Amino acid sequence: MIRRQQRSTSFPYTTLFRSLSAESIFVIFAIYKNKIHETQFERFYQKLQYSNTFFTRSLMQQKHWESRLIDIRHHGYSDSYIKIHYIMENRVTKLFNIKYPIIQGGMVWCSGWRLASAVSNNGGLGLLGAGSMHPEMLVEHIRKMKEATDKPWGINVPLLYPEIDRLMDIIIQEGVKIVFTSAGSPKKWTPLLKSHGITVVHVVSSALFAKKCEEVGVDAIVAEGFEAGGHNGREETTTLTLIPNVAASCSLPVIAAGGISSGKSVAAAMTLGAEGVQIGTRFAVAAESSAHPAFKQRVFDTDEGGTMLALKKLAPTRLIKNEFFNQVKALEDAGAEAAQLTELLGKGRAKKGIFEGDMTEGELEIGQIASMLHKEETVAEIMEDIVADFNKTMSKLGDLKL
């Protein structure tokens, strides 16, 4: 028998359903202790079906619900409170054929095959970061990915990469199925990639760019806000403002990025109109990340004001404040031109900081949520924590009303 509590009946239907596409909720059910009686389940099902206009009845097929009932009746629960479980299937999970709508950012010097395969093996979508790989190294990581996972995965390719033609040839030749592009226009490469059956996603920082991406045929959009680490948009629009604007501007699935690290922030992104999230910083300091231990520790030591956008005359980049950052800021404050900043930047600054561990002269790219991270975790621990925190957050929202 279900113990009746406010939390079991006060579920935020409209909050969740407005944030996701109509087909995004596969099934939502409440379970208490040992078994749930069929009539009680059917009442909950009827309430779910008719309490909102966003739920699609076509998903309510009898066979699906019968199989879910069988699953419920064969599992006991000993918790003292009703738990609300969310099993989602939306346009993002369908597009990539993944369990959770969680994508790991393809970060330079962090996102090798170990990190990306771990994310894919734990239900998300892992991305190799091609921006810090020579062509031969990319081939090596692609082949190791194929050995490490049989789950979907992809590659992030900055379109301003100097050997972009060679990278795209490798991606096509190696049969990569998913490509995220960034730092440039997707107009040239999207038709070619899609002609080879590749799913294409592009990173944008404004609703205007989202519309242009839809026009050239990309399959989804990553809307990345001001909080994100590394290369950033010139608009300096926060994620809280960017996501609803992008979601309203185009019909493509929107993946939120920038300042997202927990289940709470995933829930927030979805209520704003996203159907998935891309997480960079938290995965950058995961155990499987190829980042140097000194870089990870510096991230853990960073407080709320410890990062700032720099290099705005070149490509706006969020960095940890270190000696290199101070040199950049001094030049910018003095009105330096792009050529002077380029000379200071030189080559290999990001590698020096993130991969080699030079905390003084290296370029330390990381997001604002660094201040929320305090220890190294495995990818499995991160994924488990995000999912549990999301479910707990959505359950708590059921008790909130204005």
Predicted regions mapped to residue ranges:
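Conserved active-site-proximal phosphate/metal-binding subdomains
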Residues: G233-I255, S261-L402
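Short, small-residue-biased leader/transition segments that mark boundaries at the very start
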Residues: M1-L16
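Active-site entrance/lid segments in N-terminal catalytic domains of soluble metabolic enzymes
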Residues: H85-S249, P253
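Short, Lys/Arg-enriched N-terminal segments with co-localized hydrophobic residues
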Residues: H74-I87
